[in-house]
């Protein structure tokens, strides 16, 4: 089954702040796109990015014709009849989040395989690895036509955890791009019925360096991911396992492990305190809550974390002396605690979602590997925001240590800030340059 994602209470509070300032960001995006409204599509061989024309509102929704609705309903009925028996025989489990019944991944796989064998372009879902499109040839043909300014369309279907059917039809007609979206659910009588149909203007779309397709059909805001990635082939599972194990548990948002250069001889501006909640989650398989620890407002807002817990959580992942660690992490000998700030409206550094992927693993020696990581940010229209190399030392007990990080490539787009959450740990950009 697919994994559920949770938002911490502090992060929820921050969303309220972004609601107040989000319109300003959207307005800037609209001004930028309006200045390019006469640009429809770049020529073949260049980055094929469509920009919105005559967009005067925040809503990208367009009118759906009755003919389009009828065609969708006809196809939904046809496809649902192919997998109806599998759905009816599948074990149903009540979803704790949406008030609907879910079916297991095994049954979803069976449905997908039947539709794949029928030749339909279907999203192949997985409980661990990223979804990807089976029978993707239609997308490649579609994209070649788009680059040559030829009318074209291609349709992608997917099966949800409830067994419902989702439909996306990408269209390029008369130089204008749009996406026709629809969803169909099984009702109480076990009949499929279309519950929504809408059409959205495509604001941007392109192929990544790995020849995966992405598109944007809503305006960029701080409340959601505006761009969606449709992988057209499966990931390299061996490399993706490395991404899952070493990169994703830490990430890039409000933690700087992968955002600046450092090594075991010079930790530079690496902030250990901001790693506490990430590594706590790795060690305990649960989230850390600031309310569980004493909270102080002087000399700055922070939770006081017992030294043993803090050190036992972070130290095993690094080669550093306890003396240097305590100095860098602001150890308070009097209370035998370390300060830690949860992400809040006071310290959050907003950046759109990033997609890291380990593209290579280099064996340095018997116990050391170097991971080459490419980071995409599709909301900023780049599949190569930056590249960094992470050095890992593997241990005999299956654990590991982070030995170093080096940023080897950055483009014209600014990468996420490496600043720490706690004010006294923040640094000047000159300090960053000196330690690079």
Enumerate the predicted regions with their spans:
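Core hydrophobic alpha-helical transmembrane segments of single-pass membrane proteins
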Residues: 12-22
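Short stretches within intrinsically disordered, low-complexity N-terminal or propeptide regions
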Residues: 12-13, 29, 42
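Mature, Sec-exported extracytoplasmic domains of Gram-positive
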Residues: 32-436
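Hydrophobic single-pass membrane-insertion segments
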Residues: 23-34
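N-terminal Sec-pathway targeting helices
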Residues: 2-14
């Amino acid at each position: 089954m697919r994994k559920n994602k949770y938002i911490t209470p502090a992060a929820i509070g921050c969303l309220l702040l972004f609601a107040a300032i989000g319109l300003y960001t959207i307005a800037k995006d609209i001004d930028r796109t309006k200045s390019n409204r006469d640009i429809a599509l770049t020529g073949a061989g260049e980055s094929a990015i469509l920009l919105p024309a005559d967009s005067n509102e925040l809503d990208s929704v367009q009118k759906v014709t009755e003919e389009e609705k009828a065609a969708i309903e006809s196809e939904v009925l046809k496809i649902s009849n192919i997998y109806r028996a599998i759905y009816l025989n599948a074990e149903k489990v009540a979803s704790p989040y949406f008030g609907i019944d879910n079916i297991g991944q095994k049954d979803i796989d069976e449905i997908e395989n039947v539709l794949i064998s029928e030749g339909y372009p279907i999203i192949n879902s997985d409980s661990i690895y990223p979804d990807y499109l089976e029978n993707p040839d239609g997308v490649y043909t579609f994209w070649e036509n788009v680059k040559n300014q030829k009318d074209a369309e291609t349709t992608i279907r997917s099966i949800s955890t409830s067994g419902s059917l989702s439909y996306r039809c990408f269209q390029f007609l008369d130089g204008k791009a749009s996406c026709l979206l629809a969803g169909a659910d099984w009702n109480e009588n076990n009949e499929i019925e279309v519950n929504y149909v809408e059409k959205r203007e495509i604001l941007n779309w392109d192929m990544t360096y790995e020849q995966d397709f992405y598109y944007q059909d809503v305006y960029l805001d701080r409340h959601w991911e505006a761009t969606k990635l449709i992988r057209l082939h499966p990931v390299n599972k061996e490399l993706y396992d490395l991404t899952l194990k070493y990169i994703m548990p830490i990430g890039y948002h409000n933690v700087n492990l992968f955002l600046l250069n450092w090594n075991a001889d010079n930790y530079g501006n690496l902030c250990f305190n901001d790693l506490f909640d990430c590594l706590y989650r790795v060690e305990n398989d649960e989230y850390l809550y600031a309310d569980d620890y004493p909270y102080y407002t002087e000399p700055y807002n922070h939770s006081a974390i017992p030294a043993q817990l803090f050190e036992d959580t972070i130290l095993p992942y690094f080669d550093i002396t306890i003396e240097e660690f305590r100095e860098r992490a602001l150890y308070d000998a009097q209370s035998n605690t370390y300060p830690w700030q949860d992400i809040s409206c006071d310290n959050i550094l907003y950046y759109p979602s990033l997609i890291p992927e380990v593209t290579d693993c280099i064996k340095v020696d018997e116990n050391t590997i170097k991971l080459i990581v490419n980071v995409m940010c599709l909301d900023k229209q780049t599949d190569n925001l930056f590249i960094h190399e992470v050095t890992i030392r593997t241990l005999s007990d299956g654990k590991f240590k982070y030995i170093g990080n080096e940023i080897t490539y950055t483009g014209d787009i600014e990468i996420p800030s490496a600043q720490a959450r706690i004010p006294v740990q923040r640094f000047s950009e000159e300090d960053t340059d000196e330690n690079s």
